[in-house]
UniProtKB/Swiss-Prot annotation:
EC id: 3.6.1.9
An annotated GO BP: nucleotide metabolic process
Superkingdom in the source lineage: Bacteria
Cofactor(s) recorded in Swiss-Prot or TrEMBL: a divalent metal cation
Name the record gives this protein: dTTP/UTP pyrophosphatase
Organism of origin: Thermus thermophilus (strain ATCC 27634 / DSM 579 / HB8)
Record field: catalytic activity: dTTP + H2O = dTMP + diphosphate + H(+); UTP + H2O = UMP + diphosphate + H(+)
Single GO term (MF): dTTP diphosphatase activity
Length: 187
């Protein structure tokens, strides 16, 4: 940045979020908050917002960005699968169906906090058992909400996305960039 501004502190362990922000030219410092992600009895969209807020509030710094992504299948949260078998079950349930992906972010600047939730509609094509086995065997879905990564091998599972693709990846990049830019925090 060259202006002596502090780095953007990313309150997330997601390598995807870090890579997206670095691709825009932001210097990033990762500070993974020790926030429990299980057990909050909230609807999916509210859960994403609550988790993003908790993560952001748990980290110190002038410029902090936290985010959380929740996969919503008919009002049920599909988190990160515990193991390959649960990943297989998730993909069977998503096969040929529409689901929602909610990504919430919490942006703290020296003057304010901005919180938003963005939602994309994701349509999976019908998947064969062989395709599911192939994807599960890759291991890609084990660390991702819903058990798939739209930006990796999981792109083969999708029929279409309505809304911001990067919401599905884990951060509505254009919106976050616009908010940072408008507040003078530029790459």
């Amino acid at each position: 940045m060259g202006s002596g501004k502090p780095p953007l502190i990313l309150a997330s362990g997601s390598p995807r979020r870090k890579a997206l922000l670095e691709a825009l030219g932001y210097p990033i410092r990762v500070a993974v908050p020790g926030v429990e992600e299980e057990g909050l009895p909230l609807p999916p969209k509210a859960l994403a917002q609550a988790l993003a807020r908790r993560k952001g509030e748990a980290v110190q710094g002038e410029w902090v960005l936290a985010a959380d992504t929740v996969v919503d299948l008919d009002g049920e949260v599909l988190g990160k699968p515990k193991d390959p078998e649960e990943n297989r079950l998730f993909l069977r349930r998503l096969s040929g169906r529409l689901h929602l992906v909610h990504t919430a972010f919490y942006l703290r600047t020296p003057k304010e906090v901005v919180e938003e939730v963005h939602t994309a509609r994701v349509f999976f094509r019908p998947l064969s058992e062989e395709e599911i086995a192939w994807y599960v065997g890759s291991g890609e879905g084990l660390d991702k909400a819903g058990g798939y990564g739209a930006q990796g091998l999981g792109m083969a599972l999708l029929e279409r996305v309505e809304g911001d693709f990067y919401t599905v990846v884990g951060l509505p990049v254009s919106r976050v960039f616009a908010l940072l830019w408008a507040r003078g925090f530029r790459p």
